[in-house]
Amino acid sequence: MFEKLLVPVDLSPQSQMMATAAARMASYGVREVVLYSALEHHSKRDPLLKAIDDRLGESGLKHRVVTEVRKDPASAILKAAEAQGSTMIAMAASGKGRVREFFVGSTSLAVIRRSKLPVLLDKFPMEADSDPVGFVEHSPGLLDSVLVTLDLSKATKHMMPYVQQLVDAGARRVTLLHVVQSSRYSITDERRFQEVNRKLEEHRSKLETGDCQVDTYVRFGTSTYNILESAREAEATLIMLGTTGKSYLRGATLGST
């Protein structure tokens, strides 16, 4: 999953941090990073792009820069990922370049919805803009604590191989989470909670965990609130969500916290 990353950059502090994070991921199996810029005014001679390229060079990772002129950033990113043979797209959730916005919510969402590859979406705090490199270098490892949200539908079986890949890549701790929906079940529905616990344990038992600590966790209520609360409690460094379409799993979205 991590072997060949496509990292779209708009040269904002956010995309600089994403590229720096990619440079730290060699231990997770990253072998090559392709820096991709689709902004019209950029070229390989841009000093900021060169600085990011140099940082990747210091990491020892194989890397290169691809620049293109494109009007639709989401389509450009997806086409570039396919053309470069990427195994994952790693991008900042939002950012503002020196000329115009590139990564906005709609772009990130479009990439997630349409990508057949896993997407690593990283959102960095605004206060990190003053020292983007220092912020990333002092942050915990991406796979230190992974929260995996499972809806326990038929699509879950397609998601578990991605979880195994995270474990194999060096995840220290993985928490398998299911939220029992308050709109469909009662908190006193013992039968439902027993069924959920059984299914989570089945998925946990099939993982080859090695040195990784794998826990299961069940919450009750609405998905968004409980995922965020669980991430806070587990001190999650990464949240893994399945993305679905027409009842089958198309890929996985990884969101760094």
Feature roles, as predicted:
Residues A81-G134, A231-T257:
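Gly/Ser-rich helix-loop-strand patches that form or flank binding pockets
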Residues K4, R31-V34, K62, D144-S145, ...:
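Residues at the starts of beta-strands that form the adenosine-phosphate
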Residues T20-K62, T67, K79-E82, F135-E137, ...:
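Acidic, proline/glycine-rich short linear motifs
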Residues M18, R45-D46, F102, D131-P132, ...:
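Short, well-ordered secondary-structure micro-motifs
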Residues S139-L207:
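Conserved small-residue-rich
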